[in-house]
């Protein structure tokens, strides 16, 4: 299996196993109130290290790529303490992802798993919706012959 796909599948498994999460889905942005709190994992983007091309490496040579999936935490009805509830689930997700040995193994010795930040709807003039995007970066060596 492709490493990108394996990483994304593992992220959904991790999200589904978190205490307090009713549902974990992939690439779905419509999740009913009854299935929340939930985490939706979005595949998002991937970029190759451009330095390899500048060094004259052929296109089939191994290359480090960075994928940037997003975990969208969705709460149910607006809780009175939406900020603390989102932060609690963010902390659980970040800890679970950064300490997961399977993800570390998938990234490999030359790769890495990194928390890249979060974004919310909480702010002056915003919707105050109970959702938070949690961003990760996974770097791994792409070996075309292993795809």
Predicted regions and their residues:
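Charged, amphipathic alpha-helical segments and their flanking helix caps
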Residues: 1-36, 45-147
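Two-metal-ion RNase H-like nuclease active-site motif
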Residues: 41
